[in-house]
């Protein structure tokens, strides 16, 4: 694992010639004509990168770091994970796959972490790898003893404006006392931690988004005092629903795989290769 700053990652990009990593993380852009390797190596953070072995004394990047950056540059598919905790600054992470290699890039404020996640050549292996990385980012927690709840997403958006209207809406759905309490906690960002996952596919999106297609649904992992809850966006017919269920590892893994399968790559998500 390499831990550095946003500027440190910029230096590594300039030295390796990797023009783009994960724009969804809001990182410092690299301007190839201006941000040369020579200019980057004059940045004070270059000395820190040399001290940890990411750069050698000649200013060359460690081969392993170069490989990690190449996976980000040439990624075929990935997940964007946004994590929020009460009173804390959000963390964003991109879990990226190129061919059979997976790499993770995290950003928390000015700090970034770059590390390999492993390799996988089949769907079972890739699914286990992805849910393992999601669990690594979110931590391990007991599943909440929640009897599953399904709500109409459009009705929810139309009816709910604040905590009071949320409670009224949930009561109209005939939730029991435990369901009402847990769903209310999950919806309150001051009482729960949230991680939202969105799937990304490279090579098929519009030019304005660097040909990255962003999936049209999400999975959320919510940690409450009662335990972990999984929230999955589901479309049935012409209606959109939010399904809340106990956040066990297997339930989250299934929801994440269904999320990725909704990309154009479909069932080939673990082996899809983008056309350059």
Curated annotation (Swiss-Prot):
Keywords: Chaperone, Cytoplasm. Coiled coil: none annotated. Its main location: cytoplasm. It is found in: Cytoplasm. One of its GO terms (cellular component) is cytoplasm. InterPro entries: EspG (IPR025734). It comes from the Bacteria. Pfam families: ESX-1_EspG. Specific chaperone for cognate PE/PPE proteins. Plays an important role in preventing aggregation of PE/PPE dimers. Belongs to the EspG family. Interacts specifically with ESX-2-dependent PE/PPE proteins. This is ESX-2 secretion-associated protein EspG2. It comes from Mycobacterium tuberculosis (strain CDC 1551 / Oshkosh).
């Amino acid at each position: 694992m390499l831990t550095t700053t946003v500027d440190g990652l910029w230096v590594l990009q300039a030295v390796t010639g990797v023009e783009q990593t994960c724009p969804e993380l809001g990182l410092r852009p690299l301007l190839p004509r201006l941000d040369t390797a020579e200019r980057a190596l004059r940045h004070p953070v270059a000395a820190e990168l040399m001290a940890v072995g990411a750069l050698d004394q000649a200013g060359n990047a460690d081969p392993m770091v170069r490989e990690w950056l190449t996976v980000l540059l040439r990624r075929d598919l990935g997940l964007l994970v946004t994590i929020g905790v009460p009173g804390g600054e959000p963390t964003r992470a991109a879990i990226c796959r190129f061919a059979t290699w997976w790499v993770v890039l995290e950003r928390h404020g000015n700090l970034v972490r770059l590390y390999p996640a492993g390799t996988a050549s089949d769907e079972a292996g890739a699914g286990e790898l992805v849910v393992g990385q999601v669990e690594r980012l979110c931590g391990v927690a007991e599943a909440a003893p929640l009897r599953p709840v399904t709500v109409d997403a459009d009705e929810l958006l139309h009816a709910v404006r604040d905590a009071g209207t949320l409670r009224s809406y949930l009561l109209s759905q005939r939730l029991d006392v435990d369901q009402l309490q847990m769903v209310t906690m999950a919806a309150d960002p001051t009482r729960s931690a949230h991680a939202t996952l969105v799937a990304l596919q490279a090579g098929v999106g519009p030019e304005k988004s660097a040909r990255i297609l962003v999936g049209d649904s999400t999975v959320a992992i919510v940690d409450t005092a009662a335990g972990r809850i999984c929230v999955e966006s589901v479309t049935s017919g012409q209606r959109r629903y939010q399904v809340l269920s106990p956040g066990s590892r297997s339930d989250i893994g299934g929801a994440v795989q269904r999320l990725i399968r909704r990309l154009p790559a479909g069932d080939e998500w673990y082996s899809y290769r983008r056309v350059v």
